[in-house]
């Protein structure tokens, strides 16, 4: 039994060796290659995730930088406005003493010009105010004239309304009369036409009766003559037979 077992094991080993020789790759090598492939796939997956995260981070960083750049000009503009704001106020006091100095140097001529200019300004202000009362007076005069005209025209309008009311009444009366006359005339005409139409019908009927009688009278002699002729012919025929 032991000999058989040994022999069979040797045969199995020989078969495996032959397969390895044919393939050229050992099972250990296959397992190692598979493990390396799996590790490589994991590494590639991890690297891809890292790359995606880096891209997202880069995009977020770019957006943040853009926002910061946008905010920076706004802040600069605000600072510039704030910086420019006090400058006119600072310049005003500086110009004030200079103006005073120049006023002192020029002395009376400018003051005299101002004195001459004030009356002109006062007259100009009074001039536009002056036309206002005239316009008010004109408006009041127009309203008064309109009211007077309305009061003057009121009696004449009443007088015109009275004849206008009477005229429609007078116009209605003839219209009613003409309507009644128009309604009566057709009835009278129909009655006259019927009265005139009846006698001719009687005359026609009587003439027709007379014609019938005459026709009967005319036909009777003819019939009697025909009968006589027929009888004479019959007699002649009888005589011939006899």
Swiss-Prot record:
Residues 31-60 form the IQ domain. Residues 1-242 are annotated as: Disordered. GO terms for cellular component: cytoplasm; dendrite; filopodium membrane; growth cone membrane; perikaryon; plasma membrane; postsynaptic density. Residues 142-157 have a biased composition (Polar residues). The modification Phosphothreonine is found at residue 185. It is found in: Cell membrane; Cell projection, Growth cone membrane; Synapse; Cell projection, Filopodium membrane. InterPro entries: IQ_motif_EF-hand-BS (IPR000048), Neuromodulin (IPR001422), Neuromodulin_C (IPR017454), Neuromodulin_gap-junction_N (IPR018947), Neuromodulin_P_site (IPR033137), Neuromodulin_palmitoyl_site (IPR018243). It is a peripheral membrane protein. A lipid is attached at residues 3-4 (S-palmitoyl cysteine). Its main location: membrane. Residues 171-203 have a biased composition (Low complexity). Belongs to the neuromodulin family. Identified in a complex containing FGFR4, NCAM1, CDH2, PLCG1, FRS2, SRC, SHC1, GAP43 and CTTN. Interacts (via IQ domain) with calmodulin. Binds calmodulin with a greater affinity in the absence of Ca(2+) than in its presence. This protein is associated with nerve growth. It is a major component of the motile 'growth cones' that form the tips of elongating axons. Plays a role in axonal and dendritic filopodia induction. This is Neuromodulin. It comes from Felis catus.
């Amino acid at each position: 039994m032991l000999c058989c077992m040994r022999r069979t094991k040797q045969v199995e080993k020989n078969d495996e060796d032959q397969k390895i020789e044919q393939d050229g790759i050992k099972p250990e090598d296959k397992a190692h290659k598979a493990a390396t492939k799996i590790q490589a796939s994991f590494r590639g997956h991890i690297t891809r995730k890292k790359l995606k995260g880096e891209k997202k981070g880069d995009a977020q960083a770019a957006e943040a930088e853009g926002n910061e750049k946008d905010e920076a000009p706004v802040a600069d503009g605000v600072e510039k406005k704030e910086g420019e704001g006090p400058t006119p106020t600072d310049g005003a006091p500086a110009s004030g003493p200079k103006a005073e100095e120049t006023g002192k140097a020029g002395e009376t001529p400018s003051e005299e010009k101002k004195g001459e200019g004030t009356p002109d300004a006062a007259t100009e202000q009074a001039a536009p105010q002056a036309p206002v009362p005239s316009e008010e007076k004109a408006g009041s005069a127009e309203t008064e004239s309109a009211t007077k005209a309305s009061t003057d025209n009121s009696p004449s309008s009443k007088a015109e309304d009275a004849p206008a009311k009477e005229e429609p009444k007078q116009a209605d009366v003839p219209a009613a009369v003409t309507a009644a006359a128009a309604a009566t005339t057709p009835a009278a005409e129909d009655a006259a036409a019927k009265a005139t139409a009846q006698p001719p019908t009687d005359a026609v009927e009587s003439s027709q009766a007379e014609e019938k009688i005459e026709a009967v009278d005319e036909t009777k002699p003819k019939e009697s003559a025909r009968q006589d002729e027929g009888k004479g012919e019959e007699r002649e025929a009888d005589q011939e037979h006899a």
